[in-house]
């Protein structure tokens, strides 16, 4: 069942925030490019022996079978950090942890999330309408079902933490912090970003949201490629998942 409409005032506010964020962000990016302060290649490529790459993915594969969906991201992040340390690759430099100040990555991530959240929700709604038109099933994402069937505020709080902290940290470390830099070593930026975004969308195993998640993956990949800051990607992902979770909690997301 589709999501109920927001009250008119909230709808108008969401549109105003989206348009304002998108227009000002586009102008800021254009000015930064023109001034030579922004360019592709800020994120360092990564080269590792094939055995170590396979070991990371082997650990990820095993973690899928462990109880609790959060293990996949956390175990993956731990395995990646261990491999990087093994090869004496500084985590701070590789993940760009000092590239932006705290206020810069918080503010910029909120700016980007505010610009893309509503368009991606509209794209997801369009995909749902298309599926319904062709008579294809439109099941919820597993994570959405967990929110819809949560029992009590304690379980909701745990789900909110998993969605806004654990998932962004684990997924961004894996996709933007590991897979994209590995591909970037051999491929141009656009190809590395696109392939990583496709894998990111596909591993969510939800055909209905494949296109919106792919576009979101492109946004995250561009953010990492242009800033070199994994924290920026984690924060964008935090805001996006947080906005989505708030819609579900307040009853304005998909219905059971």
Where are these regions (language model features)?
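Structural signal for membrane-spanning alpha-helices in multi-pass inner-membrane proteins
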Residues: 59, 79-84, 112, 116, ...
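Juxtamembrane helix-loop-helix connectors linking adjacent transmembrane helices
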Residues: 61-69, 85-166, 185, 254-256
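Functionally important transmembrane alpha-helices
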Residues: 190-256
């Amino acid at each position: 069942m589709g999501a109920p409409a927001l009250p008119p005032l909230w709808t108008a506010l969401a549109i105003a925030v989206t348009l304002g964020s998108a227009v000002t962000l586009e102008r800021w990016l254009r000015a930064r490019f023109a001034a030579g302060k922004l360019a592709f290649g800020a994120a360092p490529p990564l080269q590792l022996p094939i055995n170590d790459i396979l070991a990371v993915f082997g650990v990820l594969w095993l973690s899928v079978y462990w109880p609790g969906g959060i293990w996949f991201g956390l175990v993956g992040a731990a395995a990646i950090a261990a491999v990087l340390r093994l090869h004496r690759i500084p985590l701070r430099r590789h993940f760009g942890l000092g590239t932006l100040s705290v206020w810069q990555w918080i503010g910029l991530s909120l700016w980007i999330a505010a610009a893309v959240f509503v368009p991606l929700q509209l794209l997801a709604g369009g995909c749902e309408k298309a599926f319904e038109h062709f008579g294809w099933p439109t099941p919820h994402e597993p994570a959405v079902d967990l929110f819809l069937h949560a029992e009590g505020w304690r379980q909701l709080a745990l789900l909110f933490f998993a969605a806004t902290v654990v998932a962004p940290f684990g997924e961004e470390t894996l996709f933007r912090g590991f897979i994209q830099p590995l591909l970037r070593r051999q491929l141009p930026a656009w190809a590395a970003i696109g392939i990583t975004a496709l894998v990111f969308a596909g591993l969510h195993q939800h055909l209905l949201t494949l296109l919106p998640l792919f576009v979101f993956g492109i946004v995250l990949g561009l953010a990492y490629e242009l800033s070199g800051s994994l924290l920026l990607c984690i924060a964008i992902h935090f805001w996006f998942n947080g906005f989505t979770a708030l819609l579900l909690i307040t009853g304005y997301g998909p219905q059971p």
